[in-house]
Amino acid sequence: MSEMTPREIVSELNKHIIGQDNAKRSVAIALRNRWRRMQLDEELRHEVTPKNILMIGPTGVGKTEIARRLAKLANAPFIKVEATKFTEVGYVGKEVDSIIRDLTDAAVKMVRVQAIEKNRYRAEELAEERILDVLIPPAKNNWGQAEQQQEPSAARQTFRKKLREGQLDDKEIEINLAAAPMGVEIMAPPGMEEMTSQLQSIFQNLGGQKQKPRKLKIKDAMKLLVEEEAAKLVNPEELKQDAIDAVEQHGIVFIDEIDKICKRGETSGPDVSREGVQRDLLPLVEGCTVSTKHGMVKTDHILFIASGAFQVAKPSDLIPELQGRLPIRVELQALTTSDFERILTEPNASVTVQYKALMATEGVNIEFTDSGIKRIAEAAWQVNETTENIGARRLHTVLERLMEEISYNASDLHGQNITIDAEYVSKHLDALVADEDLSRFIL
């Protein structure tokens, strides 16, 4: 679990997301409160429930990007889902309980990686011994059994030194490795994923753990043996319990497009993929117990962050019970021309940096001037205003159009320097931006 302070979390988010300070502060405080809760005594800790967040803002302003970056910072079980993928219980489609099952699967994977990393040093030692046994087979007694030697032989020590120094990396050896489990692919209707995964695990375990001889270079064999030995050192039952604890205490669920499941107008009959989904989400957000293949998971202390553009619907269109369970409201602002300029230059891997790196692979040096970046930002903002406002995503469309000619001819431009200034941008984009019909279909 992350021990970063809210200020550190916001600082880290600032490297990738421009503006939206209120949203960053809210998620940073929510993440820090997870850590604060774990410092309390057990009785009080049980009473402190997370304050779920509802992020409201137009498309392309950074809602989903905040979730993506938060997943990397949290160091906790995290899952992002689309609200539109679910239907009410009893109808064809995914049930909302599958959110917790997927979160638990993600936690098991995360905890397994951590456990393997923790045991890596011991696994490397065991893998080393297995390779040395192939290079220098141990002496055998009269019954054909390997004898236990008190001290490793001088030859074994010499080979161990060479192995650690990488002198034997390209030598080929034959070694027994665990055979890959039998691959069984089962297609099932939506909502029955749990059953298919259980059937797959049954079929895969039918053959037992078989060893298969393989010829490999020592450096490749070492990697596979380390993974195999590390997996043996991990206790599967402990791992499952640790994963369930991590989900219950630190789990975070990000539900995107929640505005798409708001009821629109007066409709008759059941609304299985809108209001029905909201009703099914209630027990998860409030706190219930969900059955997963790894065990029972309580959702009382899982943090839920919901987001939506709410361009057609309003937050008040959500059913009142769900509104009450999302007490923290954060409004993200539409992006301005100056925001677009900052998006093009400030993030660690901004779009302009990506294009420069891509063209550099062909030996073409691209330089974006300040005037060029300003003109690109103005063009993107202008197209957003005259057509659909898709936020920062418009920059990708505009830049792709701007760079099309260079990208196409890059292999013939090796060694050239190209400067993209205001004049270059105007020459390639002005006609499209000015013609509303063209920009509607091309940009």
Swiss-Prot record:
- UniProt keyword list: ATP-binding, Chaperone, Cytoplasm, Nucleotide-binding, Stress response
Q: Which GO terms describe its molecular function?
A: ATP binding; ATP hydrolysis activity; peptidase activity; proteasome-activating activity
Does the keyword Chaperone belong to this entry?
yes
One Gene Ontology term from the biological process aspect of the record: protein unfolding
Q: What is any Pfam family matched here?
A: AAA_2
Induction annotation = By heat shock.
| Cellular compartment(s) | Cytoplasm
Superkingdom, taxonomy of origin? Bacteria
> Under the cellular component aspect of Gene Ontology, which terms does the record hold?
HslUV protease complex
Residue positions binding ATP: I18, G60, V61, G62, K63, T64, E65, D256, E321, R393
InterPro entries, alphabetized: AAA+_ATPase, ATP-dep_Clp_protease_ClpX, ATPase_AAA_core, Clp_ATPase_C, HslU, P-loop_NTPase
Q: How does it assemble?
A: A double ring-shaped homohexamer of HslV is capped on each side by a ring-shaped HslU homohexamer. The assembly of the HslU/HslV complex is dependent on binding of ATP.
Functionally, this protein is described as follows: ATPase subunit of a proteasome-like degradation complex; this subunit has chaperone activity. The binding of ATP and its subsequent hydrolysis by HslU are essential for unfolding of protein substrates subsequently hydrolyzed by HslV. HslU recognizes the N-terminal part of its protein substrates and unfolds these before they are guided to HslV for hydrolysis.
What does the sequence similarity comment in the record state about its family?
A: Belongs to the ClpX chaperone family. HslU subfamily.
What this protein is called in its record is ATP-dependent protease ATPase subunit HslU
- Which species does this protein come from? Salmonella typhi
Gene name of the record: hslU
